[in-house]
């Protein structure tokens, strides 16, 4: 295709009479360029769709967990579709394996248009064995807002180390100091009753709080975050908790994020000084 394009580009154009208008109708050359551009755009779209399908397979987790991840990603895309740019990561970054095939990962990132409240959202899955011999399967969905708002982001991360054990992080991480901004705490956590999900989880058998060994993780999650260790005896028990409790809660919390956080705010509420905005951007980039 490249050779044909070069041949067309450097071939001699037909001679025109001085009285001939070059703008009466498109030349054969411009039609070919337009056709090639359309074909390339179609090829890019097909290729992007194939890579997206590959990502959406979530091949190393249960069907129940896969369905929730697919549902959440599709919901975000459907909600903001006109305001999201296509994923621009190279194919070898979007899906890759190590040389011996013992580890595989896939990443999917879409940035927001200029008018979108979303800066970007990311989905990923990672499968691999660690030196201790444990096989880890990590799935993540996170959505990050622009610095035009201080509203919380959304995150769901699941770290599974066996068929009957996993760590769950489900949260709307805050983006400002909650002690200095009690109204923020009230609006996004108290008024939304976000802590009720964590409390409900802790009533289930096999579910207990998880304390991350990372001080960084412990300071960035909100007071209402569901940071939990689920450890049960049977695989079916884990599937039941995921299907009947984690899935519905994740969808409801994403709905809260849509309605309370990922929306256009009025100018008065959105107004921030330049120093405050720069501080927010610096904080966001640290993640």
What do the predicted segments below correspond to?
Residues 3, 71-74, 78, 82-189, ...:
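Phosphate/adenylate-binding glycine loop and adjacent helical scaffold
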Residues 31-100:
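Charged, compositionally biased non-catalytic regions
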Residues 169-284:
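Mixed-charge (acidic/basic) macromolecular-recognition segments
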Residues 1-41:
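N-terminal chloroplast transit peptides
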Residues 43, 47, 61-68, 72, ...:
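Non-membrane alpha-helical secondary structure
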């Amino acid at each position: 295709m490249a050779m044909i394009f070069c041949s067309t580009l450097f071939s001699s154009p037909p001679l025109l009479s001085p009285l001939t208008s070059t703008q009466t109708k498109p030349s054969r050359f411009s039609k070919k360029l337009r056709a090639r551009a359309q074909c390339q755009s179609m090829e890019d779209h097909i290729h992007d769709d194939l890579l997206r399908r590959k990502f959406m397979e979530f091949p190393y987790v249960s069907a129940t967990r896969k369905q929730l991840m697919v549902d959440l990603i599709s919901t975000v895309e459907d909600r903001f579709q006109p305001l999201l740019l296509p994923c621009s990561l190279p194919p070898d970054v979007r899906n890759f394996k190590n040389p011996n095939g013992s580890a595989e990962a896939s990443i999917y990132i879409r940035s927001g248009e200029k008018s979108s409240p979303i800066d970007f959202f990311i989905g990923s899955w990672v499968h691999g064995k660690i030196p201790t011999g444990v096989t880890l399967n990590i799935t993540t969905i996170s959505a990050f807002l622009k610095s035009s708002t201080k509203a919380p982001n959304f995150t769901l991360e699941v770290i599974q180390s066996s068929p009957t054990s996993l760590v769950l992080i489900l949260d709307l991480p805050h983006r400002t100091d909650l002690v200095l901004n009690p109204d923020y705490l009230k609006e996004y956590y108290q008024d939304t009753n976000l802590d009720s999900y964590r409390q409900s989880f802790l009533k289930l058998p096999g579910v207990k709080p998880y304390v991350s060994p990372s001080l960084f993780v412990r300071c960035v999650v909100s007071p209402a975050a569901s940071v939990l260790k689920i450890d049960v005896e049977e695989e079916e028990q884990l599937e039941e908790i995921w299907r009947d409790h984690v899935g519905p809660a994740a969808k409801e919390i994403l709905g809260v994020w849509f309605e309370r956080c990922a929306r256009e705010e009025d100018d008065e509420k959105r107004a921030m000084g330049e120093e405050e905005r720069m501080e927010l951007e610096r904080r966001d980039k640290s993640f």
